[in-house]
A protein has these predicted regions:
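Charged interaction scaffolds used for protein-protein
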Residues: 1-6, 10, 18-21, 25-39, ...
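Short, hydrophobic/amphipathic alpha-helical patches that form generic packing surfaces
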Residues: 40-51
Length: 105
Protein backbone atom coordinates (compact mmCIF):
# COMPACT_ATOMS: atom_id res chain seq x y z
CA UNK A 1 0.00 0.00 0.00
CA UNK A 2 1.70 3.14 -1.14
CA UNK A 3 -1.19 5.17 0.21
CA UNK A 4 -3.34 5.15 3.30
CA UNK A 5 -6.80 6.67 3.62
CA UNK A 6 -7.61 8.58 6.80
CA UNK A 7 -10.94 10.37 7.23
CA UNK A 8 -11.56 10.10 3.48
CA UNK A 9 -8.20 11.65 2.53
CA UNK A 10 -5.43 9.67 0.85
CA UNK A 11 -1.87 10.10 2.10
CA UNK A 12 1.32 8.56 0.75
CA UNK A 13 2.56 5.78 3.01
CA UNK A 14 5.78 4.03 2.05
CA UNK A 15 9.08 3.12 3.62
CA UNK A 16 11.65 5.90 3.44
CA UNK A 17 14.91 6.41 5.27
CA UNK A 18 13.13 9.16 7.20
CA UNK A 19 10.58 6.62 8.41
CA UNK A 20 13.38 4.55 9.93
CA UNK A 21 14.80 7.64 11.65
CA UNK A 22 11.37 8.66 12.95
CA UNK A 23 10.78 5.18 14.34
CA UNK A 24 14.13 5.31 16.17
CA UNK A 25 13.22 8.71 17.64
CA UNK A 26 9.74 7.54 18.67
CA UNK A 27 10.78 4.24 20.24
CA UNK A 28 14.51 4.34 20.85
CA UNK A 29 14.82 1.13 18.81
CA UNK A 30 15.67 0.34 15.21
CA UNK A 31 12.80 -0.44 12.85
CA UNK A 32 14.71 -3.53 11.76
CA UNK A 33 14.07 -4.89 15.28
CA UNK A 34 10.28 -4.74 14.88
CA UNK A 35 8.62 -8.02 15.71
CA UNK A 36 4.88 -8.40 15.19
CA UNK A 37 3.83 -6.29 18.16
CA UNK A 38 0.88 -4.15 17.15
CA UNK A 39 2.23 -0.99 18.75
CA UNK A 40 5.53 -1.27 16.87
CA UNK A 41 3.83 -1.96 13.55
CA UNK A 42 1.37 0.88 14.06
CA UNK A 43 4.17 3.26 15.02
CA UNK A 44 6.16 2.26 11.94
CA UNK A 45 3.14 2.79 9.66
CA UNK A 46 2.72 6.25 11.21
CA UNK A 47 6.40 6.99 10.58
CA UNK A 48 6.05 5.80 6.97
CA UNK A 49 3.03 8.03 6.38
CA UNK A 50 4.59 11.08 8.05
CA UNK A 51 7.88 10.71 6.17
CA UNK A 52 6.28 9.96 2.80
CA UNK A 53 4.07 13.02 3.23
CA UNK A 54 7.14 15.14 4.02
CA UNK A 55 8.94 13.77 0.97
CA UNK A 56 5.93 14.43 -1.29
CA UNK A 57 5.11 17.83 0.26
CA UNK A 58 1.72 16.65 1.49
CA UNK A 59 0.34 18.15 4.69
CA UNK A 60 0.06 15.54 7.46
CA UNK A 61 -1.01 17.03 10.78
CA UNK A 62 -1.63 13.92 12.87
CA UNK A 63 0.16 13.00 16.05
CA UNK A 64 0.90 9.33 16.60
CA UNK A 65 -2.06 9.04 18.98
CA UNK A 66 -4.44 10.82 16.58
CA UNK A 67 -3.24 8.54 13.79
CA UNK A 68 -3.73 5.44 15.95
CA UNK A 69 -7.27 6.52 16.81
CA UNK A 70 -8.15 6.58 13.10
CA UNK A 71 -6.49 3.32 11.99
CA UNK A 72 -8.34 0.01 12.11
CA UNK A 73 -6.79 -3.42 12.70
CA UNK A 74 -7.77 -4.32 9.12
CA UNK A 75 -5.74 -1.38 7.81
CA UNK A 76 -2.71 -2.55 9.81
CA UNK A 77 -3.11 -6.11 8.51
CA UNK A 78 -3.49 -4.90 4.92
CA UNK A 79 -0.39 -2.72 5.15
CA UNK A 80 1.65 -5.52 6.75
CA UNK A 81 0.56 -8.01 4.07
CA UNK A 82 1.43 -5.53 1.31
CA UNK A 83 4.90 -4.89 2.76
CA UNK A 84 5.52 -8.63 3.07
CA UNK A 85 4.41 -9.21 -0.53
CA UNK A 86 6.71 -6.43 -1.76
CA UNK A 87 9.64 -7.87 0.22
CA UNK A 88 9.02 -11.34 -1.23
CA UNK A 89 8.82 -9.89 -4.75
CA UNK A 90 12.13 -8.08 -4.20
CA UNK A 91 13.79 -11.30 -3.05
CA UNK A 92 12.42 -13.15 -6.08
CA UNK A 93 13.72 -10.43 -8.41
CA UNK A 94 17.16 -10.57 -6.80
CA UNK A 95 17.24 -14.35 -7.17
CA UNK A 96 16.40 -14.01 -10.87
CA UNK A 97 19.27 -11.55 -11.31
CA UNK A 98 21.85 -13.65 -9.46
CA UNK A 99 22.32 -16.46 -12.03
CA UNK A 100 22.79 -14.01 -14.90
CA UNK A 101 25.26 -11.99 -12.86
CA UNK A 102 27.30 -15.14 -12.25
CA UNK A 103 27.34 -16.05 -15.96
CA UNK A 104 28.82 -12.67 -16.88
CA UNK A 105 31.83 -13.14 -14.57
Amino acid sequence: MNKITINGNEYPCRQTMGAFLRFKRETGREATDIKQELTDVLTFIYCCAASACDADHVEFNYTLIQFADLITPDMVNEWTAQMQAEAEANVANEQKKSPSALKNN
